[in-house]
């Protein structure tokens, strides 16, 4: 039984390999290509591509920069009331961005993957015998879960070690200043009997345990008057509150991977087109698309509290990916055939992977993490505003599917 089932997979895999290595099939696509041929104008298309590169670059850079600059100004500002209001505004903006990412995965990426892998240029078997887009998206979502877990565990352990070392050094320095309970004689830590190193270790353990207990008691308190006592939680639990930034680092990096992988395909598809009729509506649609995605990514990067150079690097790579794809597409347009089976399979697989990554990130790391948090449940006004922002973001991005 097992040998017969395993042997049935072999022809299936051979069919996939044979279909990818097949020749181009422009004749099959003739029904949809006539309009493009009538509107074909390489000079006008090249001018529009240059406009698209500039517009998409500016839109993407602006989208990713707004949350980064806003978060930095909020962090640098000294006002207490302004910080609270801008904090609520940031939560609303993040909810809007989560809706954008969710719609990108479901409405744009899955649809594009289905369109590529059901193209008439690909043989019916195996590409229409099995739902490859959904299957690859599922595998990508599961792989993202594993990477999310492993990455978060790694960053949190590293952060705890750094925190414990810093607490031990501070406590030991304080005791030395007070002339307290450390042996002065042979205290260089060479022998393991009550030297400075052992004292620092013991002090560090006690300091960390006390801070952990103190922070736990205040951060997880009940709602007071419909909202969490943020000032109290922040004042006494600051050391413990820094922990989530490790998770935000992983979230921002995985989200960038999902966005960048499909941005390359989008840019390449626009770059190889020689039809102004196709390119013209895409310029505005992709500019809005890039702005919304940049806004979502910028919010995650700012929450990760990365160093300025790391944040700039992530924002820079996001902003240039689609314009770079357009440039490469324009350069290879004379000999690249987007209807070749190999190009269609690569596009469909990458779009499916991007869909799985973005759907997982939107539902698990953006929507569930914020909408099920105590801060949200203790603030009904913030709850209502966040749901409205979430639906607005999803609807705005879904509407772009009419043009993009």
From Swiss-Prot:
Topological region Extracellular: 23-49, 108-129, 270-280, 333-343
Transmembrane regions listed in the UniProt entry: 50-70, 87-107, 130-150, 249-269, 281-301, 312-332, 344-364, 384-404
GO molecular function, one term: zinc ion transmembrane transporter activity
Keyword field contains Transport: yes
Segments in the Cytoplasmic topological domain: 71-86, 151-248, 302-311, 365-383
GO BP annotations listed: zinc ion transmembrane transport
Location(s), subcellular: Cell membrane
Leader sequence residues: 1-22
Recorded GO CC terms: plasma membrane
InterPro entries: ZIP, Zn/Fe_permease_fun/pln
A Pfam cross-reference name: Zip
Topology in the lipid bilayer: Multi-pass membrane protein
Record keywords: Cell membrane, Ion transport, Membrane, Signal, Transmembrane, Transmembrane helix, Transport, Zinc, Zinc transport
Function in brief: Zinc transporter that may be involved in zinc uptake from the rhizosphere.
Family: Belongs to the ZIP transporter (TC 2.A.5) family.
Protein's name in the database: Zinc transporter 10
Species, as recorded: Oryza sativa subsp. japonica (Rice)
Lineage of producing organism: Eukaryota, Viridiplantae, Streptophyta, Embryophyta, Tracheophyta
Gene: ZIP10
């Amino acid at each position: 039984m097992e040998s017969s089932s395993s042997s049935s997979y072999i022809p299936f895999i051979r069919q996939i390999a044979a279909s990818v290595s097949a020749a181009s099939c422009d004749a099959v696509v003739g029904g949809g290509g006539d309009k493009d041929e009538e509107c074909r104008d390489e000079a006008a298309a090249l001018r529009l591509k240059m406009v698209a590169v500039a517009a998409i670059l500016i839109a993407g850079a602006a989208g990713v920069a707004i949350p980064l600059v806003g978060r930095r100004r909020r962090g640098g500002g000294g006002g207490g009331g302004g910080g609270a209001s801008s904090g609520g505004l940031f939560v609303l903006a993040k909810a809007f961005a989560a809706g954008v990412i969710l719609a990108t995965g479901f409405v744009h990426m899955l649809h594009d993957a289905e369109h590529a892998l059901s193209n008439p240029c690909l043989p019916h078997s195996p590409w229409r015998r099995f739902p490859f887009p959904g299957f690859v998206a599922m595998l990508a979502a599961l792989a993202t879960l594993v990477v999310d877990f492993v990455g978060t565990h790694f960053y949190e352990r590293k952060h705890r070690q750094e925190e414990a070392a810093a607490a031990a050094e501070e406590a030991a320095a304080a005791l030395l200043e007070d002339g307290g309970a450390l042996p002065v004689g042979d205290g260089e830590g060479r022998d393991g009997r009550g030297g400075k190193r052992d004292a620092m270790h013991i002090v560090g353990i006690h300091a960390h345990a006390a801070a952990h207990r103190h922070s736990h008691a205040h951060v997880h308190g009940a709602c007071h008057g419909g909202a969490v006592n943020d000032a109290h939680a922040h004042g006494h639990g600051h050391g413990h509150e820094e922990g989530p930034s490790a998770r935000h680092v992983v979230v921002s990096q995985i989200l960038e991977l999902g966005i960048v992988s499909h941005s390359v395909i989008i840019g390449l598809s626009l770059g190889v087109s020689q039809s102004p009729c196709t390119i013209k509506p895409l310029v505005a649609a992709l500019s809005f698309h890039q702005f919304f995605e940049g806004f979502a990514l910028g919010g995650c990067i700012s929450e990760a509290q990365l160093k300025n150079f790391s944040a700039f690097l992530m924002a820079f790579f996001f902003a240039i990916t689609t314009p770079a794809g357009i440039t490469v597409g324009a350069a290879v347009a004379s000999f690249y055939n987007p209807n070749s089976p190999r190009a269609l399979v690569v596009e469909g697989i990458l779009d499916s992977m991007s869909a799985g990554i973005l759907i997982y990130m939107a539902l698990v790391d953006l929507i569930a993490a914020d909408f099920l948090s105590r801060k949200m449940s203790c603030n009904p006004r913030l709850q209502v505003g966040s749901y409205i922002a979430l639906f607005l973001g999803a609807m705005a991005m879904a509407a772009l599917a009419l043009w993009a």
